[in-house]
């Protein structure tokens, strides 16, 4: 089979089609091979695969392909985490409606329809990357089958006392109008004002100055706190003060958590400004007042400010405080504000009835399980442990939305019973299906309209892919799974919640190992965003350079680190593939299809250059194997170095003379080595550039590519061959460079070359590889000589500087120039060092424009070449 002249990225589509039709990556449930199961992250179906996805999926695919080649039965599924607010918002935007305009179930159908479209788009993009997924193992969280499992997890955890309903402070997004978990709160720095406000004493004697950034919460102020050791306020503890503008009285209390140095050291406690307020309210058993409602507007306790959004209310209250003389001063301040991770709206803390997972009860076991899991890189575990240590709230799992897994619960208005669905009735939507109270028999129950947090769906993925609830035998055999790959940005959500659910439902760890990838930044070094204009789409890269070049860019990074996208690195990967293609094409000109079967058989190799490349190849195989075992994907750099520099630039150049020569045995050995190296390199490349590898394997009839990783052949590990080969390689490189610098063609013949060395090992190496050096460099006669060359530097020509001699010596200028031209070494030295007294005047070094010298050996003019990295010198006779 002939190879086309140029590497064409269009072959990738043909190869992807071949893989899909053959189902080559299908997980074999009957196989006796050891299983390797990857808990693939299910992306949110936005309809667009971004570069961060491409990085993560490349990492996963390298692992999957490597493990398959190492003899594992790999289960590499694809999931879709469908539910969530962004889809609801998009549906409202597309159809020009709000979710309250249409029937709840109709709205859900519109969300499902959009999600299906988006999944199809992203499925195509994942396939275009060449990801070796078993598409028969795809799961979608909005399907009845998945919802049943999500609801079953809820029911079982409720029965075990790990899920409860209660009225507690929760993080609330006014834009999304739903509760959110602490893990979904991001923090953004913003400029604000610290307002110093007078609180008059209730007895009329003076006032207390407090500092706050949130005067809009003053209507819900329930106390003022100071540090018990603060000398400024010790005598005032227990005294009452009046909240300005709102008129109600609050007590001054002592608490050791107050920072004396912040503001005035006196802080107002409101329900609720932040987490600390919640802590203080519980600790001091303070009254709870609802300052802000679910829409982010002030409530009736705010009086004339009722109905105002927080920002607007803040402005008006500050204005009134100024008018009334309560505002003393304002200072600029930078503060970290909690915002919703989806819409970036500042969150509020409000008291509502919600469903919670009692994560605090599970923390000791979660910590224990986290230690059982191998974290790559290891320091990423600290992020999870720090998150656990700081956790003082339970996980709020109810959401006030529509497009999500329904909470399978009803409420009995007669007896107050909370009715939870039986497992055999799942999946179930309480808003569509009635139920009977198991206490009083009432059939007229109130359905729960809240839905589950999407993390409640995605936190059971390792259980779902191992057939939890469907096949007990399969589940027991395959759970926990081997690997979870994910981003560091969701350690405190997806990783944490998955461990929580696994501990709660199975008592086991969910996976043996977790590999963490970083974020992708733009060429400008900033996070990719449309507003910055630094977004690069995977489709754009694939269209220009192909999927394999994109994969090579992704591979050349360190697990856990953030990665900067650079077009030049993609281009480098593409040029590497073209270079490799050209090398394979050259080799194929000498390896016809009819001799390939013979080349697959073992062969005794004696040529030192063949032995050199074969030994170097074994080192590469060993290195790449070890690196991939430890998730060091940037081992691709080692493959680059070997293929580009050792194989293409050097070995192929050094083997050409044999391939084009008349020695059939030498030719046969060269062909065998070429085929062997290409076979092994293609296999090493396969996890990184599978399309390229597959196509070369087809051309070269390489067997079992996707299921056989190369093994080190100890027969070919030969330290002496490596040393000798390096000496020969450096000799060839140095003399080829001499040819290029001398304006000679690289294939121009050299009549006679002597290589001198005083080093014994170098002398042996040069003698051993002399025929290859001679043949590669087209040297007619080559001598390897032990010792030093008797070199002598002689003047060939001295060029006078006419521009300086003429004006100075005038009519004697010609005589001076003749004297300079004919100067011997002694005369030249005198001119240069001290000046030469003549009848015409003093001749100095500035009168000489140039001195041309030549090397002579045994009376014959020669060129000399210092051989880079080798204790040797080549003498080239002219």
Swiss-Prot record:
Location of the protein in the cell: Cytoplasm
Binding site for ATP: 530
GO cellular component terms, A-Z: cytosol
Motif stretch ('KMSKS' region): 527-531
InterPro entries membership: aa-tRNA-synth_I_CS (IPR001412), aa-tRNA-synth_Ia (IPR002300), Anticodon_Ia_Val (IPR033705), M/V/L/I-tRNA-synth_anticd-bd (IPR013155), Rossmann-like_a/b/a_fold (IPR014729), tRNAsynth_Ia_anticodon-bd (IPR009080), Val/Leu/Ile-tRNA-synth_edit (IPR009008), Valine-tRNA_ligase_type_2 (IPR022874)
Keyword Ligase set for record: yes
Top EC class for this record: ligase
Single GO molecular function: valine-tRNA ligase activity
Domain of life: Archaea
Keyword ATP-binding set for record: yes
Short sequence motif 'HIGH' region: positions: 43-53
Gene Ontology annotations of biological process type: valyl-tRNA aminoacylation
PROSITE patterns: AA_TRNA_LIGASE_I (PS00178)
Main location (coarse class): cytoplasm
UniProt keywords, alphabetically: Aminoacyl-tRNA synthetase, ATP-binding, Cytoplasm, Ligase, Nucleotide-binding, Protein biosynthesis
Reactions catalysed: tRNA(Val) + L-valine + ATP = L-valyl-tRNA(Val) + AMP + diphosphate
Pfam families in alphabetical order: Anticodon_1, tRNA-synt_1
EC number: 6.1.1.9
Coiled coil feature spans: none
PANTHER family listed in its UniProt record: VALINE--TRNA LIGASE, CHLOROPLASTIC_MITOCHONDRIAL 2 (PTHR11946:SF93), VALYL-TRNA SYNTHETASES (PTHR11946)
Assigned protein family: Belongs to the class-I aminoacyl-tRNA synthetase family. ValS type 2 subfamily.
Role summary: Catalyzes the attachment of valine to tRNA(Val). As ValRS can inadvertently accommodate and process structurally similar amino acids such as threonine, to avoid such errors, it has a 'posttransfer' editing activity that hydrolyzes mischarged Thr-tRNA(Val) in a tRNA-dependent manner.
Domain notes: ValRS has two distinct active sites: one for aminoacylation and one for editing. The misactivated threonine is translocated from the active site to the editing site.
HAMAP family the UniProt entry points to: Val_tRNA_synth_type2 (MF_02005)
Name of this chain's protein: Valine--tRNA ligase
Species, as recorded: Methanocaldococcus jannaschii (strain ATCC 43067 / DSM 2661 / JAL-1 / JCM 10045 / NBRC 100440) (Methanococcus jannaschii)
Gene: valS
């Amino acid at each position: 089979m002939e190879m086309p002249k140029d590497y064409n990225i269009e072959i990738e589509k043909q190869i992807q089609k071949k893989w899909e039709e053959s189902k080559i990556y299908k997980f074999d449930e009957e196989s006796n091979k050891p299983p390797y199961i990857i808990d693939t992250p299910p992306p949110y179906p936005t309809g667009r695969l971004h570069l961060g996805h491409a990085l993560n999926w490349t990492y996963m695919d390298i692992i999957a392909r490597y493990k398959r080649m190492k003899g594992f039965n790999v289960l590499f599924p694809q999931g879709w985490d469908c539910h969530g607010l962004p889809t609801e918002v998009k549906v409202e935007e597309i159809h020009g409606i709000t979710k309250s305009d249409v029937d709840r179930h109709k709205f859900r159908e519109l969300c499902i329809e959009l999600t299906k479209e988006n999944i199809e788009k992203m499925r195509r993009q994942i396939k275009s990357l060449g990801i070796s997924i078993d598409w028969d193992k795809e799961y979608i969280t909005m399907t009845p089958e998945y919802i049943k499992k999500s609801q079953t997890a809820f029911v079982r955890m409720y029965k075990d006392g790990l899920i409860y309903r209660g009225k507690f402070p929760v993080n609330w997004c006014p834009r999304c109008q739903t509760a959110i978990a602490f893990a979904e709160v991001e923090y953004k720095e913003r400029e604000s004002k610290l307002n110093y406000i007078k609180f008059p004493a209730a007895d009329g004697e003076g006032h207390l100055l407090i500092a706050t950034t949130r005067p809009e919460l003053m209507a819900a102020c329930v106390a003022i706190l100071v540090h018990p050791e603060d000398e400024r306020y010790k005598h005032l503890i227990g005294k009452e003060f009046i909240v300005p503008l709102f008129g109600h009285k609050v007590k001054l209390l002592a608490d050791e958590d107050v920072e004396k140095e912040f503001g005035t050291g006196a802080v107002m406690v409101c329900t609720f400004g932040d987490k600390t307020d919640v802590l203080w309210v519980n600790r001091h058993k303070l009254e709870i007042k609802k300052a802000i409602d679910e829409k982010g507007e002030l409530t009736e306790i705010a009086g004339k400010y009722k109905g105002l959004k927080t920002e607007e209310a803040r402005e008006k209250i500050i204005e009134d405080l100024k008018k009334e003389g309560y505002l003393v001063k304002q200072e600029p301040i930078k503060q970290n504000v909690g915002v919703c991770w989806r819409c970036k709206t500042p969150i509020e803390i409000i008291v509502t009835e919600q469903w919670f997972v009692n994560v605090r009860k599970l923390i000791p076991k979660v910590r224990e399980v986290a230690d059982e899991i191998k974290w790559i890189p290891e320091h990423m575990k600290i992020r999870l442990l720090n998150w656990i240590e700081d956790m003082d709230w339970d996980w709020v799992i109810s959401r006030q939305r529509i497009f999500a897994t329904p909470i399978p619960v009803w409420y009995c208005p007669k007896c107050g019973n909370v009715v939870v669905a039986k497992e055999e009735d799942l999946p179930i939507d309480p808003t569509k299906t009635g139920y009977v109270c198991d206490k009083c028999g009432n059939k007229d129950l109130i359905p729960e309209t809240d839905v589950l947090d999407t993390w409640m769906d995605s936190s059971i993925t390792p259980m779902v892919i191992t057939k939890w609830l469907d096949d007990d035998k399969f589940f027991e055999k395959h759970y926990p799974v081997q690997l979870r790959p994910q981003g560091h940005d969701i350690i405190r959500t997806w990783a944490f919640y998955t461990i929580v659910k696994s501990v709660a439902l199975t008592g086991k760890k969910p996976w043996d190992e977790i590999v963490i990838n970083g974020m992708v930044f733009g060429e400008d070094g900033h996070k990719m965003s449309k507003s910055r204009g630094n977004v690069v789409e995977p489709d754009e890269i694939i269209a220009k350079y192909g999927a394999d070049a994109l994969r090579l860019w992704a591979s050349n990074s360190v697990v856990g680190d953030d990665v900067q996208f650079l077009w030049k690195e993609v281009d480098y990967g593409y040029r590497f593939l073209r270079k490799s293609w050209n090398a394979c094409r050259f080799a194929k000109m000498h390896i016809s299809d009819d001799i390939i079967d013979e080349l697959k058989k073992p062969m005794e190799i004696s040529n030192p250059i063949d032995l050199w490349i074969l030994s170097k190849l074994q080192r590469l195989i060993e290195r790449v194997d070890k690196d991939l075992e430890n998730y060091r994907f940037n081992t691709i750099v080692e493959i680059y170095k070997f293929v580009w520099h050792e194989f293409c630039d050097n070995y192929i150049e050094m083997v050409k003379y044999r391939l084009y020569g008349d020695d059939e045995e030498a030719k046969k050995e060269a062909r065998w080595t070429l085929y062997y190296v290409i076979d092994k390199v293609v296999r090493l490349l396969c996890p990184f550039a599978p399309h390229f590898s597959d196509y070369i394997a087809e051309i070269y009839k390489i067997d079992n590519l996707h299921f056989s990783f190369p093994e080190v052949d100890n027969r070919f590990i030969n330290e002496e061959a490596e040393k000798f080969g390096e000496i020969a390689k450096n000799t060839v490189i140095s003399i080829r460079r001499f040819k290029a610098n001398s304006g000679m063609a690289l294939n121009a013949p050299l009549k006679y070359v002597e290589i001198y060395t005083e080093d014994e090992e170098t002398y042996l190496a040069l003698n051993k590889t002399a025929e290859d050096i001679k043949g590669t460099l087209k040297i007619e006669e080559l001598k390897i000589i032990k010792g030093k060359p008797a070199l002598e530097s002689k003047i060939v020509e001295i060029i006078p500087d006419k521009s300086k001699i003429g004006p100075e010596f005038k009519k004697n200028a010609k005589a001076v120039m003749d004297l300079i031209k004919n100067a011997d070494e002694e005369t030249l030295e005198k001119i240069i060092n001290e000046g030469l007294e003549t009848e015409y005047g003093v001749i100095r070094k500035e009168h000489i424009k140039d001195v041309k010298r030549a090397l002579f050996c045994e009376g014959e003019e020669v060129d000399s070449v210092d051989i880079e990295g080798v204790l040797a010198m080549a003498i080239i006779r002219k």
